[in-house]
Swiss-Prot record:
Organism, scientific name: Chlamydia felis (strain Fe/C-56)
Signal peptide: none
Protein name (record): UDP-N-acetylglucosamine--N-acetylmuramyl-(pentapeptide) pyrophosphoryl-undecaprenol N-acetylglucosamine transferase
GO cellular component: plasma membrane
Primary location class: membrane
Keyword Lipoprotein: no
Assigned EC number: 2.4.1.227
């Protein structure tokens, strides 16, 4: 097998794609491999500059052809991105290119194919995305976050372990755990979720009548109206912290008794790691992958409950929260999450790639 010295990661878009890419980068850096991130939307991810992570912004466009004008614009962006990606790959000279899904990675994968650079993919969800499905026929292998999705690829596919970056636990997290009960975390993913921001606070105010010592850690997302959410909790007499973004997410999950969230792949992976029960309200778009993610955690693992957005109401949400906070329910769901997580693969993405080359 040829020694791997350099790897390019084709990634961009939401945290659901970028977070696993950064975890993968960490794995390769420990092996002494140079890693470069290439993709659309990386300029909008501030952590890359803060942590001195090498990356190049690559234009891209979606594969949608439903709107002719947009399709023409997207085709032009794809072509510009393809030309730039090819230039960057020639300059960097990677031995392998890994795609993390979404159209943001498309030009880089196209350029890698043209340059005959071995391609690998990573699929975070229970339903493969369009780009990963398309390029899997050319890929050497696919690393996945959840083993059931492996059967949907014709090339070699295997569950791989990605490390979690846990910050040193802050005193505030420890103080919360000792001062409040229960602790509830509300999170709508890296982009936030207006549905959760609008519906969850009023339901938690009702629940607080049965749990006066409750604390809510609400992550509203970049567009969340923090002041409005704070007002609802404050008026309802609920102890809270509302933020646009949380750097210390894993420690927050560890200290929580319940998480109310969308059902993106990253939060699912983190919930399993933290073994924290959840109520999942999947985003109804994006080819239904979040609903499948939620079904897996709820029905296959037994680690929480699911409310479809079309069924969401104050009454339904309140009822689900009260059930989720029952001590027996918490115990059973934690045990189910622990049992599943203990059997997850410990093979690194690097090991998997070495086996496939």
């Amino acid at each position: 097998m040829k020694k791997i010295n350099k790897i390019a990661l084709a990634v961009g878009g939401s945290g659901g794609h970028i977070v696993p890419a950064l975890a993968t980068r960490e794995t390769f850096c420990k092996e002494g491999i140079d890693v470069l991130l290439l993709g659309k939307g990386l300029d909008n991810y501030p952590n890359l500059c803060e942590q001195d992570i090498p990356y190049r912004e690559i234009p891209s466009g979606s594969l949608s052809i439903s709107r002719p004008i947009a399709a023409i614009r997207n085709t032009r962006s794809l072509y510009i991105g393809y030309k730039k990606a090819k230039k960057e790959l020639i300059a960097f000279g990677p031995d392998v290119v890994i795609g993390f899904g979404s159209y943001h990675s498309l030009p880089v994968l196209m350029a890698a194919l043209k340059k005959k650079i071995p391609i690998f993919l990573h699929e975070q969800n229970l339903v493969p995305g369009k780009v990963n499905k398309l390029f899997s026929r050319f890929a050497k292998g696919v690393g996945v976050s959840f083993s059931p999705v492996t059967k949907q690829f014709s090339c070699p596919a295997q569950e791989v372990f990605l490390p979690k970056r846990v910050w040193a636990s802050s005193n505030s997290s420890k103080e919360l755990s000792s001062s409040y009960s229960p602790i509830i975390c509300v999170v709508g993913g890296s982009q936030g979720a207006k549905t959760l921001n609008d519906n969850v606070p009023p339901a938690l105010v009702k629940v607080a009548k049965d749990y006066p010592n409750m604390y809510v850690h609400h992550i509203a997302g970049p567009k969340g109206e923090v002041a409005s959410i704070q007002y609802v909790y404050s008026r309802g007499g609920v102890s809270f912290c509302v933020k646009h973004f949380e750097h210390d997410m894993l420690n927050i999950l560890l200290s929580s008794d319940l998480v109310i969230s969308r059902a993106g792949a990253t939060i699912l992976d983190e919930l399993l790691w933290a073994q924290t029960p959840s109520i999942l309200i999947p985003y109804p778009g994006a080819y239904g992958h979040q609903e499948e993610n939620a079904k897996f955690l709820v029905y296959t693992i037994g680690g929480g409950s699911m409310i479809l957005e079309k069924q969401l109401s104050n009454e339904v949400l309140t009822k689900n929260i009260l059930l989720a906070l029952d001590s027996k329910t918490i115990k059973n769901r934690r045990e189910a999450l622990r049992a599943y997580y203990q059997n997850k693969s410990s093979k690194s993405f690097y090991q998997f790639i070495c086996e496939c080359l």
